[in-house]
Amino acid sequence: MSENSTWGSKIGFILASAGSAIGLGAVWKFPYMTAANGGGSFLLVFLIFTLLIGLPLLLAEFVLGRGAGVSAIRTFGKLGKNKKYNVIGYIGGFALFILLSFYSVIGGWILVYLGISIADALGIHSTTDHAALFVSIISNTWIALGAQALFILLNIYIVSRGVQKGIEKASKIMMPLLFIIFLVIIARSLSLPNAMSGVTYFLKPDFSKITSSGILFALGQSFFALSIGVTAMLTYASYLDRRTNLVQSGISVVLMNIAVSIMAGLAIFPAMSSFGMESEGGPSLLFIVLPQLFNNMAFGKIFYILFLILFLFATITSSVVMLEINVGNITNQRNTNRTKFSVIIGILTFIVGIPSALSYGSLSNTLIFGKTVFDLMDFLVSNILMPLGCLALSIFTGYVLDKKVALEQLHIDENKKSSLVLFKVWLFLLRYVLPIIILIVCLAQFL
């Protein structure tokens, strides 16, 4: 691989990996689920699940990626010494291709809202009915498709520049800014009257509110929130040098993901409490509730623009890996024709994503199994492909991978008893515990 197909620094790898994990769900769904399921008690459950489930799976992807040092679709065949295992890599590549096709639709909405909000702050445009505005945007064919195309173009530009000059450079800029913007918004939110009641609502432990659905969400979120099971982290690890400590890097990624989820809640709930607004998650939070919320506070339009920029950064840092994986699969991680294949895959992604973009407009009445195309694609990736990928990852690493590869990649000293014990616990979880948990989460989503 050329120099530009490797990470320039450890922090670049960690920031890019954390950016891949920190997606929209961490910002607009996780805080709402936390507050609805006992606040601090839910956070404690999620933290335990993440350390026992998410981190072992994340380390498995890191081990496979760096251990093979090739594209995702070739990794499993190389390490398993049989090309039949490459099907796992193909599942991951397909999942991320489909995921980007509809994820880019939401990214496009954010770009449109950012433009409208800037115009609003400058007095060029004025909006009072945010619910009607949201419906008008997502149902307009040309706005939906144009915004989706623009978002994909941003991803093409970043990925076409390679690992160091594109993905790493973008991550080093966007991730620190994401945290800075969060801190600014949190400071403003906490300065409002009655803000602490919102903090209490979000973080106060109440184990009586933890429901079975909440526990299942925490279980699923413990690995889905880390972009595990679709070879995203595997691909990033394949660009890594041999000196980087994978365990330390994995813990850093996990902690950053948890931190962002908590910061999102601290940015939203105190302000909502101050203005007596009801909390909710999903797109309506960003595009309907928050505009109304920020309109009620001084300099609110500026803070809403900052929030949209924050969401845009979270979306882009997650989406670039979705494009990068398939570009890397085709170019075998060399920079040969990287720009050409970035454009080709980007165009194909846009074409496949057209029905999803039109799901709230001209195709809103087109239902497949009772779902819009957008919701069907989301269901396919979230409920089938990602769990299947996680299951395959756990079984392959636990049973097929040569233990010597794992010991080497995790820098385990076989003469240190404590290190060997932790390694055996990791292997035990992958072999016997995680497959059962993944199956439970999987089946529960169909009940």
Give the location of each predicted region.
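Transmembrane helix-boundary motif of multi-pass solute transporters/channels
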Residues: 12-49, 231-237, 247-251, 255-256, ...
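Loop-to-transmembrane helix boundary motifs in multi-pass membrane proteins
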Residues: 12-14, 20, 145-146, 256-262, ...
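A generic transmembrane alpha-helix motif of multi-pass inner-membrane proteins
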Residues: 145, 372-395, 418-447
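Hydrophobic, membrane-embedded alpha-helices of multi-pass small-molecule transporters
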Residues: 8, 15-25, 100, 104, ...
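Inter-helical loop and helix-membrane interface segments of multi-pass membrane transporters/permeases
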Residues: 4, 32-37, 67-91, 104-164, ...
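Membrane-embedded translocation segments of transport machinery
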Residues: 2-7, 168, 172-316, 340-341
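Membrane-interface "cap" regions at the ends of multi-pass membrane proteins
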Residues: 1-28, 57-62, 66-79, 83-90, ...
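Helix-loop-helix connectors at the membrane interface of multi-pass transporters/channels
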Residues: 107-139, 239-243, 248, 252-260, ...
